[in-house]
């Protein structure tokens, strides 16, 4: 089967690699550097499984800048373009998705379009009405950055949208796509759910908002424990051994961040509109409160020091361990709060060669020099590289994992 994938981020690329084991897949991107890397068997993103598969597996995979040619020949088109949250309108920016839909429909009269990008509830219905076609369906992704291909190989569930009054072809394509994902997975007995588009859209936003809720819960627990001088580690362990709660997703941090949770929680809150709620809004608020609290704690530690020159060293801007993504990283908001107090910031981030021109922080990518200059070293996730200056480190990473 010929499949086109719009977008080579962690969603699009992981799907492209997965499906190219048994299908002809063409990935479309607008960046020549990404296209060149993929065509040379190199991953443009950090993902151990993607890197290995591109290097070692026989894949029927190519990348191109020629979108029209790729879409024209495809039987299925997967759309995995960004939908960033637009704070000005308090809604997802879906223009990239809509642009691809329009382009595909202009050159292909038979392919079913499968949207993998995260979208607002009701978006598929809106697009079907706008473009007068039922050939647009939704399949939410549940992938972690840096582990996207692994999560496709071992999925928790597969969800594809389909409506009762859809044409036989669209119904067949929805089932076919679900089967493609299931047959490519290494995990057995993966649950497959076919449901309405609005329900599938809701699953995605509510699932990520629950994860954000869990992060916020353990962060607020940790705030209480630190403020009352309780052993946060012991409290969390005592709670998490309850099977109903579980020993997962319970490690305190500076706040949830990354590409999905911040924007998905805000979008769900926007979708509520006039529907009564308090919890969803509280999750978003809790994350902001946590970052402010962390900044205050750093300032308190700094003020206790007698050194005339006080420098905060930020170890890594990445959101998670082994990530290459700085987007919506909680530490960046903490840095902004500290800078508003005229505190000198130095940053160790080996993935950067320079900071943005308006950034008043200083990039120090010699680790030993960084350690010497900093009075306090702040890190969202602890690393053994800091073991020799452990007495300088402020972190709320209790379990040494994400």
UniProtKB/Swiss-Prot annotation:
Binding site for substrate: 141-145, 204, 208, 249-253, 257, 320
EC code: 1.1.1.22
Catalytic residues as annotated in Swiss-Prot or TrEMBL: 260
Keywords assigned: Capsule biogenesis/degradation, NAD, Oxidoreductase
Record-linked SMART domains: UDPG_MGDP_dh_C
Family that this chain belongs to: Belongs to the UDP-glucose/GDP-mannose dehydrogenase family.
Record's protein name: UDP-glucose 6-dehydrogenase
The species this protein was found in: Streptococcus pyogenes serotype M3 (strain SSI-1)
């Amino acid at each position: 089967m010929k499949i086109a994938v719009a977008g080579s981020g962690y969603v699009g690329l992981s799907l492209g690699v997965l499906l190219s084991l048994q299908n002809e897949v063409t990935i479309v991107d607008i960046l020549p550097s990404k296209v060149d890397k993929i065509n040379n068997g190199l991953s443009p993103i950090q993902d151990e499984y993607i890197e290995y598969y591109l290097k070692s597996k026989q894949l029927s995979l190519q990348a191109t800048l020629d979108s029209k040619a790729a879409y024209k020949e495809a039987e299925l088109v997967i759309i995995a373009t960004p939908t960033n949250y637009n704070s000005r309108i308090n809604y997802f920016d879906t223009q990239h998705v809509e642009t691809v839909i329009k382009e595909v429909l202009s050159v292909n009269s038979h392919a079913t379009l499968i949207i993998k990008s995260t979208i607002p509830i009701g978006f598929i219905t809106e697009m079907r009405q706008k473009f007068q076609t039922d050939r647009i369906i939704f399949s939410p992704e549940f992938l972690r950055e840096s582990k996207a291909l692994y999560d496709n190989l071992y999925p928790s569930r597969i969800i594809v949208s389909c409506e009762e009054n859809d044409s036989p072809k669209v119904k067949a394509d929805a089932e076919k796509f679900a089967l493609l994902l299931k047959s490519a997975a290494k995990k057995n007995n993966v649950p497959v759910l076919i449901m309405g588009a609005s329900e599938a859209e809701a699953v995605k936003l509510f699932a990520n908002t629950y994860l954000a809720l869990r992060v916020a819960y353990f962060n607020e627990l940790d705030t209480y424990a630190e403020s009352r001088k309780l052993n946060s580690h012991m409290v969390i362990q005592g709670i998490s051994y309850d099977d109903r709660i579980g020993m997962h997703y319970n490690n305190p941090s500076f706040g949830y961040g990354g590409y999905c949770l911040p924007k998905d929680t805000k979008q769900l809150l926007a979708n509520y509109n006039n529907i009564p709620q308090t919890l969803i809004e509280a999750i978003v608020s809790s994350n902001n409160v946590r970052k402010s609290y962390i900044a205050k704690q750093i300032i308190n530690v700094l003020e206790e020091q007698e050194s005339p020159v006080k420098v905060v060293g930020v170890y890594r801007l990445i959101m998670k361990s082994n990530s290459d993504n700085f987007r919506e990283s909680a530490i960046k908001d903490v840095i902004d709060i500290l800078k508003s107090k005229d505190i000198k910031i130095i940053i160790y981030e080996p993935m950067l060669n320079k900071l943005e021109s308006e950034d008043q922080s200083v990039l120090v990518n010699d680790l030993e020099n960084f350690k010497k200059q900093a009075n306090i070293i702040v890190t969202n996730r602890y690393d053994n590289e800091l073991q020799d200056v452990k007495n300088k480190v402020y972190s709320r990473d209790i379990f040494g994992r994400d």
